[in-house]
Amino acid sequence: MTLGSIPLATPDLKIADGGRNNWTLVCAPVMAETVDQMLVQMRKAKQLGADLVEIRIDFLKKFSPKNDLNILIKQAPLPTLITYRPKWEGGQYDGNESTRQEALRMAMELGTDYLDVELKVAQEFYSSIQGKKPEKVKIIVSSHNYVNTPSVEEIGNLVARIQATGADIVKIATTSVDITDNARMFQVLVHSQVPMIGLVMGERGLMSRILSAKYGGFLTFGSIEEGVISAPGQPTLTELLDLYNFKQIGADTKVHGVIGNPIGHSKSPHLYNAAFKSLGFNGIYLPLLVDSVANFINAYSSPDFVGYSYTIPHNEDGLKCCDEIDPIAKEIGAISCMIRRPTDGKLMGYNVDYLGAIAAIEEALRASNGATPASVSPLAGKLLVVMGAGGAGKALAYVGYEKGARVVVADRTYEKAKILADKVGGQAITLAELKDFHPEKGMILANTTSVGMKPRIDDTPLPKESLKNYSSVFDAIYTPKWTRLLKEAQECGATVVFGTEMFINQAFVQVERFTGVPAPKQILRDVLVKNT
């Protein structure tokens, strides 16, 4: 099934093309407790850019079927999908099944555009209408799996079962246990011979909701407000349409993303998607919650999955999955960027973590210490304490050593710190020992651990009293911009260097490597300011 072969379910469902690259509909669930509130939500959904609304009548506190359905369907500003989800399929309705199906038949007679009927009762429902379904009304027969995502064969068999009921549209929603679950849904979706909604629920299933447009899904869901969702992992309409530029995603859109765990805090999608849009580049950039890098790379080996940024804790695992590694990344022992070479599909690993961080630290030192010759780094001879021996820690320790700094590596595990310290001719200590480590004044501190990252913004990797011997403190965390560590360092008189500088500078480099053209630097800076 190609994107162009997916029929609009009804001639009454008119969508302004507006240059969109797909016909995957954007549906907003409406889940208010009263009819009036639902009408307000529907108008809001239209303002936000939805193509249709799913009216979840199982959320209504008081429901008078004939009167309420007539108002909701006739006064809706968008085409309607009526869903009356029972508790046994994950909904709110806990009453008589005959009464529920009678309401569904009434919605059909009143002219809703779409009707959701659960697979479990589909044959019973079709028998009850005796072939009297209006041509305008399209029935979505749905199946929801709240435990896992089955094999491709099992999903394919489920499609056949649903199709056999006479469904106009197939809907299958499964649950993500691992991000690779999405690949199985994509495989079924792209080969489906009938209009199909195929979604994977949960945070690890986000990509199924966004890339449904790439693989020919009939529709995807976007919530009207953040947190008010009809299924786990649902993005907002604003995220779908503005952040991910959903209507511009096509079959040939190139997929990029940031690989990490956790990943919800990442601002990378804001920057890279804005850059792609500004440059007219046909790409999408996703947050990728990955448990196993190797499994992810194996599952998404298509030439359209072309580039990734790497963050905690996967910088080192990413390196192991590369076909070729640039010399700096090899020396550091971690990558921050992976690109699929178009000529042969090989995965190339790079490390650009160090670029922004070292430049920002040097700039801060020059500003506080006065001018130094351009040929000499202000880090030369300084004691540089690097907290964390992961990917970013390795990058900073390595480049600090190259700049002439005396490097001390502190990590939770002494052995890990020792391995890195030995590579840069430095000293190793544990993070627990660091609070009492003050051999001299004017030291430089670089935190590359995740301690203090949103949402645990009250945490700090080092107590305030231990910061008095540092002249400059850098924190690789950029959410929040002002971490507790930086606030307390400034109170102690140290010059602070924000993680946003490291983040933005590596973004400049990666955007150019992903797109082949220079990054729109001011746009990226503006987006970062807006989102931190």
Can you name each region flagged by the protein language model?
Residues M1-V40, L243-T253:
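N-terminal amphipathic alpha-helix/helix-capping segment at the start of soluble metabolic enzymes
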Residues I73, T80-F125, G318-L379:
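Glycine/small-residue-rich loop that forms an oxyanion/phosphate-binding "nest" at active or ligand-binding sites
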Residues Y114, K120-K254:
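Catalytic alpha/beta core domains of metabolic enzymes, predominantly
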Residues T253-A367:
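Phosphate/diphosphate ligand-binding glycine-rich loop within oxidoreductases
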Residues V255-P262, N351-Y354, I361, L365, ...:
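Glycine-rich adenosine-cofactor-binding loop
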Residues L365-R366, G381, S472, A476-T532:
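Adenosine-phosphate binding glycine-rich loop
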Residues K403-V424:
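NAD(P)-binding Rossmann-fold cofactor-contacting core
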Residues K423-V497, E501:
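Rossmann-like adenosine-cofactor binding region
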